[in-house]
């Protein structure tokens, strides 16, 4: 078995960097959390590798218009972190609509062609529910602009929320994270592979994959071409399609249909990007600056909370 890796390190999305006040704190900047209910295979892998797992804190908060409106979902204290929201009819209607949506959305979204916009009309929720709860929450989940959410398939959203127990106020799956960062499982997996005589080639980008009768040919950036009995691609759909020298029509259709949203990620310690009201500080924070004029979504992952730092 030969493992081709274009980067000079293993892990891909599992990327741990050393940061912190004293420069000795491992922080994940890619793969961060999982749960046993929705990720049985990776849970089995971690158990097999004897990776140390610790609980994560999975909370959501939102800040709008530079802090004019803020709330969190961790507790009643964070929901009404801004005490004036308890006397704001639109905010209270939003909370009522959350319960209404959670109880009706699954039964209403049986039509696979229904969009989220159509679903909200069927359920009959307010604009505050859409603008200050559902779209920020789903935007945080998929890191995509809220403006694109209206046309998003309702069925995909509801299935995700159902699988992750987000259609109820309680009973969410316990989030888990790797003690010491995801680098720990990458290192153990590397050791396991090497013990089984897997040849690992770092910094060896594959440029083309060709199928020749009963063999598969791989050509790397160095011009080297080798034949293998089988090839497994652990790459994004668009990357996979670009690697195939002779993709079938089915491969073109299937792989080409998957779209991605580009995002920039910055590891920092700037508290000004957190909510003004500290009771709203959460593991995931959706934020909109004052007089927002960009379609880009701004999210802050509070790593101290997510990784128990």
Annotated model-derived regions:
Residues 1-20:
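Glycine-rich FAD pyrophosphate-binding loop
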Residues 13-14, 154, 182:
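Conserved donor sugar-nucleotide recognition element shared by glycan-biosynthetic enzymes
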Residues 19-28:
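Short glycine/proline- and charge-enriched loop/turn segments
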Residues 22, 66-67, 221-223:
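Glycine-centered tight beta-turn/hairpin loop motif at sheet-sheet or coil-to-beta transitions
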Residues 31-50, 186-196:
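N-terminal Rossmann-like dinucleotide/flavin-binding domain of flavoprotein oxidoreductases
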Residues 159-220, 226:
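Helical element adjacent to the flavin cofactor pocket in flavoenzyme catalytic cores
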């Amino acid at each position: 078995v030969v493992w081709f890796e274009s980067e000079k390190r293993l892990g891909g999305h599992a990327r741990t960097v050393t940061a912190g006040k004293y420069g000795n704190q491992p922080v994940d900047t890619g793969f961060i959390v999982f749960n046993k209910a929705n990720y049985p295979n990776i849970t089995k892998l971690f158990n097999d590798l004897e990776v140390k797992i610790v609980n994560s804190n999975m909370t959501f908060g939102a800040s709008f218009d530079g802090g004019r409106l803020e709330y969190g979902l961790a507790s009643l204290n964070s929901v009404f972190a801004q005490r004036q929201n308890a006397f704001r009819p639109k905010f209270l209607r939003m909370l009522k609509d959350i319960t209404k949506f959670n109880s009706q959305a699954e039964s209403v979204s049986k039509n696979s062609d229904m969009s989220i916009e159509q679903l909200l009309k069927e359920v009959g929720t307010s604009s505050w529910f859409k603008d200050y709860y559902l779209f920020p929450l789903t935007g945080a989940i998929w890191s995509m602009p809220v403006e694109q959410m209206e046309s998003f398939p309702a069925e995909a959203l509801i299935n995700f929320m159902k699988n992750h127990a987000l259609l109820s106020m309680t009973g969410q799956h316990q989030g888990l994270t790797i003690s010491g960062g995801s680098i720990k499982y990458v290192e153990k997996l590397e050791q396991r592979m090497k013990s089984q005589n897997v040849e690992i080639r770092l910094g060896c980008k594959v440029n083309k994959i060709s199928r020749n009768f009963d063999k598969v040919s791989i050509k790397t950036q160095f011009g080297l071409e080798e034949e293998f009995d089988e090839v497994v691609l652990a790459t994004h759909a668009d990357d996979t399609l670009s690697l195939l020298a002779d993709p079938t029509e089915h491969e073109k259709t299937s792989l080409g249909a998957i779209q991605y949203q580009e995002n920039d990620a910055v590891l920092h310690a700037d508290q000004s990007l957190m909510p003004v009201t500290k009771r709203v500080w959460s593991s995931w924070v959706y934020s909109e600056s004052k007089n927002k004029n960009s379609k880009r979504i701004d999210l802050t992952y509070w790593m101290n909370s997510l990784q128990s730092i």
